């Protein structure tokens, strides 16, 4: 079992990565688990993993909230349902919230934990590749609003993250590849050596080779942990983790959080951002080609959907990086390096989006 520490002073926690961790969940934790627990999950996940988790939680007072499956249900309505369960059960501020599922479940559960009784303990058990390498680490919690993704939320760190790689065996091919997009992102923005490793091991990752997958997850978590430790509240460095997300979130919102997975939208967003960087002479053409080739090698989208420019603009204007009405873009400037840029003309952005969609 591998361990990655997220260093945040008294709020530090450990990410545990390995096989067969779920059946012995309580024994894996270095601290005593809360007596009152709400497990938030969804039907897709619960049919495989809820029973072994509940067996491990024997002796605790456990309630379960099975939210409906899908990004569109990461909503205030689902949040209210979870709150009703906690209040009706008489749970107090010593309770804990366990997220058993992917990014949607984790984001909602974290927001519930951050606000119930002004904050209760929160535990992450991510079951998708995307959530294991990204959303479960770093403390971002949120629900969506009809006008944009993640507009209502808080920074709230978990007490621990337990990544059981065996959970990936039940992922669909599409959801598995969605997680690969976030892994590619880390190489592009932060670690050229890791990017090269991904190029060299694309075949193994496509085949879900356990050794390659374990390393890719561990290195991704290490990178995110380093970034979060330096910039928890996204005042500078952490913003680079949003590579591809300004365009990606616009794709998701415009297609009503259903037609594209988050990872697919991010992959298309990475291409748009990389092309924008190339066109504005920040990224050389060779590096752009490497980024595109790696996404292609992992069977990820390299073109976004066609939609009116005004739709792109409307959704991008709701991005959290907008300041004083000015769009800010995370652009790769070399493999392993990126920067936040605001000095890009709308005409240039329009032309690049047209070319990439």
Curated annotation (Swiss-Prot):
Residues noted as binding Zn(2+) in the record, renumbered to the chain: 182, 245, 262
A single Gene Ontology CC term: cytoplasm
Cofactor requirement: Co(2+); Zn(2+); NAD(+)
Keyword flag Zinc-finger: no
Cofactor remark from the record: Binds 1 divalent metal cation per subunit. Can use either Co(2+) or Zn(2+).
Localisation: Cytoplasm
GO BP annotations listed: amino acid biosynthetic process; aromatic amino acid family biosynthetic process; chorismate biosynthetic process
PANTHER family: 3-DEHYDROQUINATE SYNTHASE, 3-DEHYDROQUINATE SYNTHASE, CHLOROPLASTIC
Protein name, as recorded: 3-dehydroquinate synthase
Organism the protein comes from: Idiomarina loihiensis (strain ATCC BAA-735 / DSM 15497 / L2-TR)
Gene: aroB
């Amino acid at each position: 079992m591998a361990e990655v520490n997220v260093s945040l002073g008294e709020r530090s926690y450990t990410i545990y990565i390995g096989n067969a961790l779920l059946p012995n969940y309580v024994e894996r934790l270095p601290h005593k688990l809360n007596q009152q627990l709400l497990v938030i999950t969804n039907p897709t996940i619960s049919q495989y993993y809820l029973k072994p988790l509940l067996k491990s939680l024997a002796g605790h007072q456990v309630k379960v909230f099975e939210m409906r499956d899908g990004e569109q249900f990461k909503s205030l309505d689902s949040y209210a349902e979870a709150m009703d369960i906690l209040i009706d059960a008489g749970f107090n501020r010593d309770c804990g919230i366990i997220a058993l599922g992917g990014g949607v479940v984790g984001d909602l559960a974290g927001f519930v934990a951050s606000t119930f009784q002004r904050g209760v303990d929160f535990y992450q058990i991510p079951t998708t590749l995307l959530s294991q390498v990204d959303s479960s680490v770093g403390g971002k919690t949120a629900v969506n609003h009809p006008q944009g993704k993640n507009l209502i939320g808080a920074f709230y760190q978990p007490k621990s993250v337990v990544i059981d790689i065996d959970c990936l065996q039940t992922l669909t091919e599409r959801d598995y590849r969605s997680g690969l997009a976030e892994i590619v992102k880390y190489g592009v923005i932060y670690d050229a050596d890791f990017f090269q490793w991904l190029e060299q091991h694309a075949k193994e990752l496509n085949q879900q080779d356990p050794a390659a997958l374990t390393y890719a997850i561990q290195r991704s978590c290490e990178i995110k942990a380093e970034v979060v430790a330096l910039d928890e509240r996204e005042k500078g460095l952490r913003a680079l983790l949003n590579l591809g997300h300004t365009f990606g979130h616009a794709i998701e919102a415009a297609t009503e959080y259903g037609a594209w997975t988050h990872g697919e939208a991010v992959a298309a967003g990475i291409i748009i951002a990389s092309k924008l960087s190339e066109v504005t002479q920040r990224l050389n053409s060779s590096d752009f080609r490497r980024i595109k080739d790696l996404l292609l090698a992992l069977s990820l989208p390299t073109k976004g959907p066609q939609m009116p420019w005004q739709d792109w603009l409307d959704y991008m204007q709701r991005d959290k990086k907008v300041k004083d009405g000015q769009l800010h873009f995370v652009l790769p400037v070399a493999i392993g390096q990126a920067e936040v840029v605001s000095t890009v003309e709308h005409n240039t952005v329009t032309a690049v989006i047209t070319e990439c969609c």
